[in-house]
Amino acid sequence: MSLMTKLGFRALVASCLIAAGGAANAQVNVLITGVGSTQFPIATANFANEAGLPQQVTSIVRADLARSGKFTNIDAGSTPVPETASVDLGAWKAKGANAFVAGSVNREANGQYKVNFILYDTVKQQSLGGLSLTANDTTLRTAGHKIADYIYQKLLGVRGVFATRLSYVIKTGNRYQLQISDSDGQNARIALSSTEPIISPAWSPSGTKVAYVSFERKKPIVYIHDLPTGRRYMVSDQKGNNSAPAWSPDGNTLAVALSLTGNTQIYTVNANGGGLRRLTQSSSIDTEPFYSPDGHWIYFTSDRGGAPQIYRMPAQGESAGAAQRVTFTGSYNTSPRVSPDGKLLAYISRTGGGFKLYVQDLQTGAANAITNTNRDESPSFAANGQYILYATQSGGRNVLAAVPTDGSAPPQILSVQGGSVREPSWGPFMQ
């Protein structure tokens, strides 16, 4: 299999483009297939005044915590418990819960909701605080995700990612859709719909834009989609292939792979489409750039050594320092992604005839496969570095999967009924 084929420079098919901003009919569903070896027992009581609301905040919180693989939900019964109630923490500890959550959702005169909750440590018999959130019918889900994030951080010491978003491409029949959803696959919206392939979505650091590659003009072109306005604009339409956009940490620049002069090389372009600059100067294929979180390095895939491996160079390009090989486990490694703390490298390695997700410690060089799947591609770290989202195959279908970065639990499968889903990208923390 050639590097160009593996990296997804697909053959073109026919037809027209439809830009869209509506709700998605084909929606990703989450299947929880395993949990971590150590789980935190927590009881979340039904929030008061939830009956009849368009979204049940309590259910969203419980589902988020279960989906993380880090918590086990202790049965809290059916009786609502508001945050103002007097709580017998000893009784909840006796039921096996090391933490307890109480809350309420109250409709205000302006039609909005006030969502209040409090988190208790039943072991230390103390309050861990809470939040008071304002929401409307469409943002009640977000309120639930924010509550789960608060719980995750208070109890585990790591910022939660339930209120982040995903982007991915769903293919149903001959139609491709770039969708944006909550981290649980719900609340999906269509950013772009086309009968031409859409690949390589990449979130801006602000979480307000997604860069991607569309084949709608019979060749791959890089676009940026502004999510708040729904507008999009072309960033790179150079001669040949325009592919693999990756944002700089400051959001001002995109690294891209262009075949402008023949072999694909790494360039940078300003986010407004100007200032094109070549970074690599090899006679090989250099592609799939990705910035380190400090902005000092660009990691990329190259076959300059005879087979695809991952290299890194100064962000200013090879003129500022020679590229150095990073991966040495296996003979075929692609798709570099650096963790938010800059300590880990996720990539795809050809292993035993399949392709598996590996994680490498960038300080020691130690690398390990962390999945039990064999057709892995397109890894993307969660904003807290605790999970990796990737595309794979399960039951003969193209699906997404999320796995802890340390491989401590089996992947959770995200699939779509009647279609396939690929090209995942996990968004940053919400501003």
Swiss-Prot record:
Answer whether the UniProt record assigns the keyword Zinc to this protein.
no
Keyword Cell division tagged: yes
Q: Which GO terms describe its cellular component?
A: periplasmic space
- Pfam families named in the record: PD40, TolB_N
Example GO biological process? cell division
Q: Where's it found, cell-wise?
A: Periplasm
Q: Which InterPro entries match?
A: 6-blade_b-propeller_TolB-like, PD40, Tol-Pal_TolB, TolB_N
* Annotated stretches, region: Disordered: 411-431
Output the superkingdom of the source species: Bacteria
Task: List UniProt keywords, sorted A-Z.
Answer: Cell cycle, Cell division, Periplasm, Signal
Instruction: Give the range the annotation lists for the signal sequence.
Output: 1-26
Q: How does it assemble?
A: The Tol-Pal system is composed of five core proteins: the inner membrane proteins TolA, TolQ and TolR, the periplasmic protein TolB and the outer membrane protein Pal. They form a network linking the inner and outer membranes and the peptidoglycan layer.
Q: What's this protein's function?
A: Part of the Tol-Pal system, which plays a role in outer membrane invagination during cell division and is important for maintaining outer membrane integrity.
**What does the similarity note say?**
Belongs to the TolB family.
UniProt-recorded name of the protein: Tol-Pal system protein TolB
Task: Give the organism, scientific name.
Answer: Burkholderia vietnamiensis (strain G4 / LMG 22486) (Burkholderia cepacia (strain R1808))
Kindly list the organism's lineage: Bacteria, Pseudomonadati, Pseudomonadota, Betaproteobacteria, Burkholderiales
